[in-house]
């Protein structure tokens, strides 16, 4: 494929994304402020020293950062604008890490950028109307749906055994 994939946060999900991407022949880079460089490189992934370096190096960036006070709105105009022409931002983290207003502004200015997310952003209607063909989202985190909370189904089990 010849593309460079950047993994922003090299936890369990990031590691598995790297493992799968290797099968597509992608060159894989990762940045994680809390994961030692040696751990990343042991997996055959190139560790970079900053988020800025990751975004400026990679054609595709896959987000896996947690939503914390420090990361809220951290994926912003300045950071995403570092991506090469034709860049794709994939958010499988939390929608709160994206500064939606700044991403909309950037995508208006840079018609080469694309954005995919597995959780519908608050500004979904704006993204969908303005960026058809460059934006995709699913309505919510996908996965099994239970009719009631798991705790109400599992906790009573011992009394029925």
Region roles according to the model:
Residues 1-16, 44:
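Glycine-rich NAD(P)-binding loop of Rossmann-like domains
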Residues 12, 16, 60, 102, ...:
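Alpha-helical scaffold segments in soluble metabolic enzymes
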Residues 18, 22, 107:
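Gly/Ala-rich phosphate-binding loop of Rossmann-like dinucleotide-binding domains
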Residues 26-27:
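Residues at the starts of beta-strands that form the adenosine-phosphate
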Residues 32:
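Conserved acidic E/D residue at the C-terminus of a beta-strand in Rossmann-like folds
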Residues 35-129:
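Rossmann-like adenosine-cofactor binding region
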Residues 121-161:
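C-terminal helix-to-coil terminal segments
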